[in-house]
Amino acid sequence: MAKMLPPPSQSVPSRPPSWLYIPPRRRHGTFTSSCAFRLSPSSPSSPPPPVLDFQYIQFMDSWIEQTSLSLDLNVGLPSTARRSSAPAAPIKVLVEENFLSFKKDHEVEALEAELRRASEENKKLTEMLRAVVAKYTELQGQVNDMMSAAAAAAVNAGNHQSSTSEGGSVSPSRKRIRSVDSLDDAAHHRKPSPPFVAAAAAAAYASPDQMECTSAAAAAAAKRVVREDCKPKVSKRFVHADPSDLSLVVKDGYQWRKYGQKVTKDNPCPRAYFRCSFAPACPVKKKVQRSADDNTVLVATYEGEHNHAQPPHHDAGSKTAAAAKHSQHQPPPSAAAAVVRQQQEQAAAAGPSTEVAARKNLAEQMAATLTRDPGFKAALVTALSGRILELSPTKN
């Protein structure tokens, strides 16, 4: 009979006895619960295993059921009571904060977009202004160059006119071509008119495609305005004349110089071309032709307006034919008379102190004017020949 173990004490030990063997868990274990244990197998030499008491089995059950061995997944986390005790934020406050932040972000983006648009527009306006200033500077330089070229062309035209008057008359067709060229040059040499400036300013703020069309239209409008401004004033005068008179002279109080004659298609009578004797200072021209309907009527067409006063009648010079007939009573040419009168007025205004210098200048200018006048040469030759014939002794 097995030896009985002494009864256990009333207190439950804190740890199991050393003789209790708990095998490790195996893959195919031999126990299925915490209360099923087996003792180590006894060897033939070892004494038989002791008999387990029911109190130890209760001890093992209580030891295994301790809370420290719990398999709860919430180990170390705050309890539900503590989490529920914290005050939760109101839902209304959270919604308002989210909505206000979104609204503020939208306003900031709109302001940034507006600032970017304004900066781009300022850049475009700055570039346009710079382009307008550059074009204005370029046009100003071109105007200055054209004005200087026009002045030089006027001087050359005066010299060429004087040489032409000495060498002979020029055909009217060439004269008309030259006058048309001079009008074109004057149209190009004039400063830009206000419509052209306004059109250029409007084209500066247009798109590139519109700018080309606007510039072409502005150039055409400016050219049309310039041609209208440069177009001389035209007036006509009808004078009764003798049909047998072929001189085509219309006395209107001014001195004229004939530089050509031509027969037109619509009129069998020739047309005479005259220029004011003060040319090139005075741009007035005159065309005289008999009327195709009435041979007793002379039609005088004036182009331009005189920029000087009408000379007195007693200073009016005669033509070359009249000078040949009345050489001893030949008056000075109109240009020389005008120079003489101007110098006399200046000398009278300056006083006796400058009278000697004025007379010297007057003599030089009169000599230069008379030598350039072909009528003076013819009159001088006629006068000298007539005087020689008068002074020559007769055969009687």
From Swiss-Prot:
Keywords: Coiled coil, DNA-binding, Nucleus, Plant defense, Repressor, Transcription, Transcription regulation. InterPro entries: WRKY_dom (IPR003657), WRKY_dom_sf (IPR036576), WRKY_plant (IPR044810). It comes from the Eukaryota. One of its GO terms (cellular component) is nucleus. The keyword DNA repair does not apply. Residues 157-178, 306-335 are annotated as: Disordered. Induction: Induced by biotic elicitors (e.g. fungal chitin oligosaccharide). Accumulates in response to M.oryzae. SUPFAM superfamilies: WRKY DNA-binding domain. Residues 245-311 bind DNA. Disruption phenotype: Increased basal resistance to rice blast mediated by M.oryzae. The keyword Metal-binding does not apply. PROSITE patterns: WRKY. One of its GO terms (biological process) is response to chitin. Belongs to the WRKY group II-a family. The WRKY domain is required to bind DNA. Transcription repressor. Interacts specifically with the W box (5'-(T)TGAC[CT]-3'), a frequently occurring elicitor-responsive cis-acting element. Regulates, probably indirectly, the activation of defense-related genes during defense response. Modulates plant innate immunity against X.oryzae pv. oryzae (Xoo). Negatively regulates the basal defense responses to the compatible fungus M.oryzae. This is WRKY transcription factor WRKY28. The lineage of its organism: Eukaryota, Viridiplantae, Streptophyta, Embryophyta, Tracheophyta.
